[in-house]
Amino acid sequence: MAPRPPTATPQESVTFKDVAVNFTQEEWRHVGPAQRSLYRDVMLENYSHLVSLGYQVSKPEVIFKLEQGEEPWISERELQRPFCPDWKTRPDIKSWSSQQGVSEVSHSANVWSHATFGDIWGVNTQRHQESWRRHLGPEASSQKKITALEKIAEQNKFGEDSGLSTDLVPQLDVSSSIRPSECKTFGNNLEYNSELVTQSGIPAKKKPYKCDKCRKSFIHRSSLNKHEKIHKDDAYSNGTDQGVPSGRKHHECTDCGKTFLWRTQLTEHQRIHTGEKPFECNVCGKAFRHSSSLGQHENAHTGEKPYQCSLCGKAFQRSSSLVQHQRIHTGEKPYRCNLCGRSFRHSTSLTQHEVTHSGEKPFQCKECGKAFSRCSSLVQHERTHTGEKPFECSICGRAFGQSPSLYKHMRIHKRSKPYQSNNFSIAFEPNIPLTQGESVLTDVKSYHCIDCGKDFSHITDFTEHQRIHAGENSYDSEQALRQQSLSHPREKPYQCNVCGKAFKRSTSFIEHHRIHTGEKPYECNECGEAFSRLSSLTQHERTHTGEKPYECIDCGKAFSQSSSLIQHERTHTGEKPYECNECGRAFRKKTNLHDHQRIHTGEKPYACKECGKNFSRSSALTKHHRIHSRNKL
């Protein structure tokens, strides 16, 4: 068949689905490690060659997963074919599975070099064959034994050899002796043959290509190359230099020098430099660099969540989100800090943690040049320049730049007397305990997690939740933490055997116990002063650096401690959360309340060592000491 002229186009555009084979999660579990590696290499190679031939092939989800190292299975809904629950019990499948194994790499590679994953696992290969026949037209002949991708190369405008891998492409002359297997559940005919090599009409060939490592032989050089990768990967995992693939990443970015294994990866990477986003959402117009990102974004409009956790039933729009979620159940923390050994569930958590070692602050404000270690901190800071206040009080309409500031402001309404507004009034019944009255407003969830979008009413709950993303929770998994909190609702199960004080969390108990033992494991590198808490060391170090990261959004005054900022903000809001049970007087600081309560109790814990006089406040004792100092002069 003569090659088509350059202006000619195929009768029907080729899509990656014509050469791709997909798996469900159940099917993928039964594919061996060596076979998975072969599947990955061939799928990526075929996709790369289709793109290089000029076919407009958008990157499918399975290719994105393979490049990211994720499991490439797709949901049954995406596959749009019935899943056969009893496919594992079919005699032909069991016969094939019993003959396969990681140790028999040669046999499996040989079988797969002539067959498709669909032939072996029961995927409907008839659909692939029909689509190829459409591309080849009436000239297709079973006697020619030309594979589909070889025909694509023939249709190429210059007719040169495309180098496309035919390992995953169905042979057109499927032997009539292959008998379809019937699923007992659905009754569908699924083509399968456990002796595909000998029964498919493919003549027996010599195996001239031999592996130097294990002496296994192969018909095609490409099959030998794929087989040798198994030895390379094994050696690489054992830490030997011989296993490091040399020269495999030969596609280099001219802008930053980064290299890639596939040209398609380089093309996508270069979009970072060019800013190109060719994939646009038809609903909202948002554009993306990758087609897979567009597909995931479109799920946000449809609300579809095809990836479901088999343990708790929670569903996700992305497979990567499901993988991260499952680490909560398994307790897996694959991202480990090389400096301190701490492990994290998410790579982003590790990146944020590593900043604490390096002191790097990559996020810089374009207005004033101030730098931050986190992007979220920069966003909050930029609001001081723009004046943006997105968090608005639903009662009085006052707006704030940060959600914690709104929550602190809401306490004014919670603890105040009946509040009048132009639209409505709100009041707490005097005979109802304050905690019940507060419940009207505790539904306001002012603390928003930027990692997962979850909202919280209380900062303690929000802080505890963030530890899940950072990998800092003291429990092995979120499930264990939830069980612990359910078994001790409002209880304090951790009790000090020295003073009897009880705590809700083991971390608080450990920190408290250091008061009795005198242990101070956290030492300042500047002056050598030691502390029992890491937070105390962090606050102390700011006395050396002069850092004041906590800034008031109302007046711009900065503080080295968050507690100091909270107390300062009460001068703007007028909030006095600490109320005396005896007389009803309220205070901004808890220490002021304690000093005031001694008026009612008559307690005077501060005694003068000179004359023995007692005082209820430390400030009063300090003033009294001046009398003795003047007398000595």
Swiss-Prot record:
Gene3D superfamilies xrefs: 6.10.140.140, Classic Zinc Finger
GO terms classed as biological process: negative regulation of DNA-templated transcription; negative regulation of transcription by RNA polymerase II; positive regulation of DNA-templated transcription; regulation of transcription by RNA polymerase II
SUPFAM superfamilies registered for this protein in UniProt: beta-beta-alpha zinc fingers, KRAB domain (Kruppel-associated box)
Gene Ontology MF, one: DNA-binding transcription repressor activity, RNA polymerase II-specific
PROSITE patterns listed in its UniProt record: KRAB, ZINC_FINGER_C2H2_1, ZINC_FINGER_C2H2_2
Location(s), subcellular: Nucleus
One GO CC term, this protein: nucleus
Domain KRAB: 14-85
Zinc finger (C2H2-type) residue numbers: 209-231, 251-273, 279-301, 307-329, 335-357, 363-385, 391-413, 447-469, 494-516, 522-544, 550-572, 578-600, 606-628
Keywords assigned: DNA-binding, Isopeptide bond, Metal-binding, Nucleus, Repeat, Repressor, Transcription, Transcription regulation, Ubl conjugation, Zinc, Zinc-finger
Cross-link (Glycyl lysine isopeptide (Lys-Gly) (interchain with G-Cter in SUMO2)): K445
Domain of life: Eukaryota
Function (record text): Inhibits the transcriptional repressor activity of REST by inhibiting its binding to DNA, thereby derepressing transcription of REST target genes.
Protein family per UniProt: Belongs to the krueppel C2H2-type zinc-finger protein family.
Subunit-level organization: Interacts (via N- and C-termini) with REST (via zinc-finger DNA-binding domain); the interaction inhibits REST repressor activity.
Name this protein carries in UniProt: Zinc finger protein 90
Native organism: Rattus norvegicus
Gene field: Zfp90
